[in-house]
Structure formats: C-alpha cells, structure tokens
C-alpha cells in the first residue's frame, strides 16, 4: 500500500549540488525504512553550470543509479529521475520520471541569467538592473517561466513559488500584493490546464529559508479549489532530510481541504487517502 512517509522522490546528491553520494543516499533510505527513493539530479544548463550535472556526469549518474537499482532490488525501489530546468539543453527522455522547474530569470537589459533562489545580491541585481527596480515585475517574469514548464506536462511540477525563497521577511516584495497573487494564480491555472501534479516541498523549511512550504497555504488552498493533486517531497540534498517535514506537509495538505496525496512507487503513481 502506498505510504507517503516511505517515498522520497525529489532528491539530489554530490552528482549535482547535494551533500551526499548516490550510494550514501540509497543506504540511508534503506536504513530509514523507505520503500521508494527517486533521484532527481539537476539537468545540465549551459548558462549556469554551478549547481547542475555536466553531460559526462549525467551519464555517470545514470550508470550509478542502474547499479543501485540492482543492489537494492527487493529492499528499496530506486528510481532514476531528473529535475529538468526550463533553461536546460538536456533531453527529458530516458528517465523513470521528470520534475519540471524554473530557477532563473533572464535580464533583457544586461543579457544575464540570474539564479533567483541562491544569493540575495543576485536577486537584487536582477530586480534593479533588469526589472527597473520593480520587484513584482521580476515576480511576474518568474511565474511566467513556471507557466512554460507546466506547458511541457512534467510528471511533477516543482516548488511553484520558489521566487519567495529569499523573501521570508518581505525583503524583496509583498507576497500579499494583488500583483503577486495574480501572477501566482496564473501559473497555478497553467498547472491545472496541463494536468500537472504539484509537489508540496519541505526543502525551504529544512534549510531555514522559510517557515512555510512550497506552495504556501493560500496557494495550496487555491490548488485544492481547482481540483488539483499533490505529492509530498523534501527536495533532499542530504541523508538527514529524506522525509523531513512530511507529517507537517500532510497536515497542511489536509488543512487546505485535500483528502488524498499521490505517492510515487516502483509501480508508478498511487493515491493514498489521508
């Protein structure tokens, strides 16, 4: 029977920006009683190679996971996925599943690509140099990128409101503003139009950036009204966060009015009643 507490399918390793090896992650998953572990290394993006897998490393990633699948057969279902970025040159085929995401904004004035969830100064530069010092214009551009990802119909749509990661205290923009909410809802509608599965991602809380998940409570509530489906993920970058905050995420999902979650297993997606 599907159990969200035993399936962690948004995970990174030292192949990209994670802290533990693929082997370490698999070993920890087994020790922690997981039945499904899905790796989702960051796809190669030539414009920002700091956090992603190179083409050669991607091949190594696939080969290593193939060995782990055999090693853990009957213990943990190991899945080979990819977190595919909208800027990626990689193919999305050849994986067990793929997560779609957006992490960057293009600056029309400078020609730069800015990573919006890493360095606060980069986000400030992006807003000031390329969005006429209007933070909400950058927000609107980000959610437009999410719409592009949704249109590709990923198996899972990642951290839909990641733009808020560095904004815990409202340093950059007002998350209650009509423009922010309108842009977010437009992206949410694109997700619904393309029958996307939305992750409730606990990673920002684990790493101390946020006190709320991706998506936040109000956006999650709107997704429930739309009849959308959700899956709980941790966006794990180390062995200690494989199922971090899963019970709290389930509680938030129930509070939003959902009665079930999707769980990815070795047999595909299954529904678990809450």
Question: For each predicted feature, which ranges?
Answer:
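An N-terminally biased module of ancient metal coordination in phosphate/nucleic-acid-related enzymes
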Residues: 1-86, 164-178, 206, 231, ...
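Extended substrate/RNA-proximal surfaces in nucleic-acid metabolism proteins
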Residues: 51, 55-193
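Glycoside hydrolase catalytic-domain groove-lining segments
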Residues: 166-169, 174, 178, 185-197, ...
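Conserved residues at the C-terminal ends of beta-strands
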Residues: 40, 101, 160, 201, ...
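Long, positively charged, glycine-interspersed low-complexity recognition regions
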Residues: 212, 216-274
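Structural preference for beta-strand elements that scaffold enzyme active sites
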Residues: 4-8, 36-38, 77-79, 94-99, ...
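Conserved, mostly hydrophobic/aromatic
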Residues: 10, 29, 65, 98, ...
């Amino acid at each position: 029977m599907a159990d969200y507490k035993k399936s962690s399918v948004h995970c990174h390793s030292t192949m990209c920006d994670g802290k533990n090896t693929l082997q370490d992650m698999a070993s920890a998953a087994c020790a922690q009683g997981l039945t499904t572990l899905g790796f989702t290394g960051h796809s190669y993006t030539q414009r920002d190679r700091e956090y992603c897998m190179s083409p050669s490393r991607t091949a190594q990633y696939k080969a290593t996971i193939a060995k782990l699948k055999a090693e853990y057969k009957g213990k943990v279902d190991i899945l080979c996925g990819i977190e595919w970025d909208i800027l990626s040159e990689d193919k999305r085929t050849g994986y067990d599943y793929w997560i779609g995401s957006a992490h960057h904004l293009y600056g029309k004035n400078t020609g730069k690509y800015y990573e919006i969830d890493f360095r606060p100064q980069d986000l400030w530069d992006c807003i000031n140099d390329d969005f006429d010092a209007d933070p909400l214009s950058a927000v609107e551009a980000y959610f437009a990128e999410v719409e592009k990802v949704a249109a590709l119909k990923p198996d899972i749509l990642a951290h839909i409101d990641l733009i808020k990661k560095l904004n815990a205290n409202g340093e950059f923009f007002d998350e209650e503003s009509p423009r922010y909410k309108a842009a977010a809802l437009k992206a949410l509608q694109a997700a619904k139009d393309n029958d996307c599965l939305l992750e409730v991602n606990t990673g920002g809380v684990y790493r101390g950036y946020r006190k709320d998940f991706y998506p936040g409570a109000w956006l999650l509530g709107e997704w429930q009204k739309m009849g959308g489906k959700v899956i709980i993920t941790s966006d794990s970058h180390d062995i200690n966060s494989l199922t971090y905050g899963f019970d709290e995420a389930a509680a938030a999902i129930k509070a939003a009015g959902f009665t079930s979650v999707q769980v990815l297993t070795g047999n595909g997606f299954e529904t678990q009643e809450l």
